[in-house]
A protein has these predicted regions:
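Conserved G1/Walker A P-loop phosphate-binding module
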Residues: 1-80, 202, 224
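Canonical P-loop GTPase G-domain recognition
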Residues: 2-13, 145-197
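Helical mechanochemical/support elements of P-loop NTPase systems and associated helical scaffolds
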Residues: 20, 46, 59, 71, ...
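Hydrophobic aliphatic residues
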Residues: 41-45, 99, 162, 184
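Flexible beta-alpha connector loops of hexameric P-loop NTPases
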Residues: 78-88, 144
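Conserved C-terminal guanine-recognition region of P-loop GTPase G domains, centered on the G4
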Residues: 96-165
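Intrinsically disordered, low-complexity repeat/linker tracts enriched for polar/charged residues
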Residues: 196, 201, 206, 211, ...
């Protein structure tokens, strides 16, 4: 499998980098299993720290995919309301700036809990991404925590909403990871190293990201989202 290397961590608008390589952003509700998925993709246990407390990731983390040479960009989780109004506005501005102006952003990988019906915040973020001109790659997480019938129903719901078939994954069981890697490679526009490995003008949508779609207070380390 490819190797993931954490190269950059961004906290403020002024720190946003101009990385001249393809990027795929990873986004999802707090406690959707984003950090666990990063670790499963990396084949490691602690590349992204996992916490039982949702809403802890407060940074944008750039993971370099080697040797394919593109980035997975881990965005802060949203939907866990323990932050001041000013903090929510600050983080909304950071995410809006990144999603709407990054020329090398290929797609938004939207992580969705297999156990839940489509949620308002997920729908709002998918709408914002589409307004930015971004493709959406839906990823169902925690597939091991529901039945096959429930997974199929959820996948059908999101496919109908987004017009894209979701990838179905379980980080704990490592299922769907190789297939997801292939899909990420294809989305980034780079070839895989082996069969085993699994410039557009910026558009700023009117209204921006709803303030509810923001990370919340917690530690600055990359933790479970």
């Amino acid at each position: 499998m490819p190797t993931l290397v954490l190269e950059h961590t961004i906290y403020t608008l002024g720190q946003l980098l101009s990385v001249e390589k393809p990027q795929i952003a990873l986004a999802g509700r707090s406690n959707v299993g984003k950090s666990s998925l990063v670790n499963a993709l990396a084949g490691q246990k602690n590349l992204a720290k996992v916490s039982a407390t949702p809403g802890k990731t407060r940074s944008i983390n750039f993971y370099h995919v080697e040797p394919q040479d593109y980035y997975l960009v881990d965005l802060p989780g949203y939907g866990y309301a323990r932050a001041s109004h000013a903090e929510r506005r600050s983080w909304a501005a950071l995410l809006e700036k990144y999603l709407s102006t990054c020329r090398h952003l290929r797609a938004l990988a939207l992580l969705l809990d297999s156990r839940l019906t489509p949620q308002k915040l997920d729908l709002e973020l998918s709408h914002f991404a589409r307004e930015c001109g971004l493709d959406i790659l839906p990823i169902l997480t925690k597939a091991d925590k529901c039945t096959q019938r429930e997974r199929a129903a959820r996948a059908a719901e999101w496919a109908d909403i987004l017009g894209v078939k979701p990838s179905i994954t379980s980080s704990s069981k490592k299922s769907g990871i190789r297939e997801l890697w292939q899909r990420l490679h294809d989305t980034a526009g780079v070839p895989p190293v082996s069969p085993e490995d699994g410039p557009t003008q910026a558009v700023v949508p009117q209204g921006g990201i709803p303030h509810s779609i923001t990370p919340q207070s917690g530690s600055s380390s990359a933790t479970e989202e």
